[in-house]
Amino acid sequence: MDLFMPEIIILITALLVIITDLFLTKSKRHLAYLSLLGLGAAAVATVLNWDSPPELAFGGMWALDGYASFFRILFISLSGLVIMASVDYVNKFRRFQGEYYALVLLALLGMIMMASTTNLITMYLSLELAGLAFYVLVGFLKDQHSSESALKYLLLGGVASAMLVFGLVLIYGFSGETNLGSILNYIQTLPSGMDITAHTGFILGIILTITGLGFKVAAVPFQFWAPDVYQGSPTPITLYLSIASKAAGFALFLRLFYTVFTDPLALSQEWALIVAVLATAGMTLGNVLAIPQKNIKRMLGYSSIAHAGYILVALAAVGNSPELADGRISLLFYLVAFAVSDLVAFVSIIAISRSTGSDEIPSYEGLAKTNPVYASALTLALLSLTGFPPLAGFLAKYYIFSAAVQADLLWLMIVAAVNTVISAVFYFNVIRVMWLRQPREEVRVLASWPLKLALGISGLAVLIFGIIPETLLNLIEKATELIIH
């Protein structure tokens, strides 16, 4: 039970937030502090169990290993920073702040479960727990754009969930097992003369599973929801979807495909080719469609699709050469680098848009002259997302490119490099508007100390992970070595 203490603490904190909300009539800012206190306790519980030997729990449904612990810390940290960035923004909700923070915590619980699951049934349940919380959070503004985004996300999410379930059912029908380890054992004990890649139902199950998970990470061609949902959602939730939800989807993606579908190699290379094609489409489409955007949240929505493509490059490297650790390490490092870079960008946008009243890129004209701190922070984030040294985004792309080359995917590395150049067009357009244009009016950006602290922490992380990444790389290497099934 001690090993599940972080999840228990998060669940109790969500309940306490809802109960406390009933007794607060004026300022509800304390709900954010209560949520942060619970997240701090969950983080401490995770660290205390960090060196515990890996084990399976609840009949092999959950893995308590280094991989799960790494994502626990990552998701808890990201959720804490999102809550800090929400303190000012949630004044728009007034009566529903308790529900807002509780749903953020429940989404966190679902994402932690996604990284820990080793069973097809709990995999689906954890996905839906996080998904249901996000469906509500997306529509929290209750205006036309927010409601439209929530409905679109709900309907397309339902279709994706149906495809995922169908895929998991086909995998179960082939193996007769729901536990990932048992499915792997079944595949390994098949007659030596049997070509598993010729089993149409099983391959279809893998394709449908990729489809369902592809929706969760906004990978092409399952990305249709992302730009509209990102634009219409409350900005902190756009941030949460962009970083934490995407990371959770890839955490599940890697555990499932690395632990089950990398043996035999022919099967591994089969799905790796599919992933490589999706990566190519995602990088190209996301970057090209981001160029003409005038709304910065929508632009970052297309950018997020492109970054999902970069992460799929690492996943393709895992599939093509599963014996190499570089693919797994580069995938996790990219998730962290993208998360902290996107955090800086969106936290800056929350502060700026609250003062200007607009998310349109032209409203950022001359921002460097009126608010140099926030302009510098947003510039830092955009440079990191582009892949400029010595920032975290540069090393992340370097590791991705290196993993692709070592996995004999040179063509995919070239595609990724070309797309990196294309992405500079729209990132530098925003930088140009902020630094080279004259301000339309004198607007001072005001923000609370929690938002400033979130901006400072994430900005510092972008610099530290780019200049001295050794500690993070060591944690990631240990986490990927301890994936059990």
From Swiss-Prot:
This is NADH-quinone oxidoreductase subunit N. Pfam families: Proton_antipo_M. GO terms for molecular function: NADH dehydrogenase (ubiquinone) activity; NADH:ubiquinone reductase (non-electrogenic) activity; quinone binding. NDH-1 shuttles electrons from NADH, via FMN and iron-sulfur (Fe-S) centers, to quinones in the respiratory chain. The immediate electron acceptor for the enzyme in this species is believed to be ubiquinone. Couples the redox reaction to proton translocation (for every two electrons transferred, four hydrogen ions are translocated across the cytoplasmic membrane), and thus conserves the redox energy in a proton gradient. The lineage of its organism: Bacteria, Bacillati, Chloroflexota, Dehalococcoidia, Dehalococcoidales. The chain crosses the membrane at residues 3-23, 30-50, 67-87, 96-116, 120-140, 154-174, 202-222, 247-267, 271-291, 299-319, 332-352, 375-395, 411-431, 453-473. The keyword Transmembrane helix applies. Its main location: membrane. The keyword Translocase applies. It is a multi-pass membrane protein. It comes from Dehalococcoides mccartyi (strain ATCC BAA-2100 / JCM 16839 / KCTC 5957 / BAV1). GO terms for biological process: ATP synthesis coupled electron transport. InterPro entries: NADH-Q_OxRdtase_suN/2, ND/Mrp_TM. GO terms for cellular component: plasma membrane. Keywords: Cell membrane, Membrane, NAD, Quinone, Translocase, Transmembrane, Transmembrane helix, Transport, Ubiquinone. Belongs to the complex I subunit 2 family. It is found in: Cell membrane. It catalyses: a quinone + NADH + 5 H(+)(in) = a quinol + NAD(+) + 4 H(+)(out).
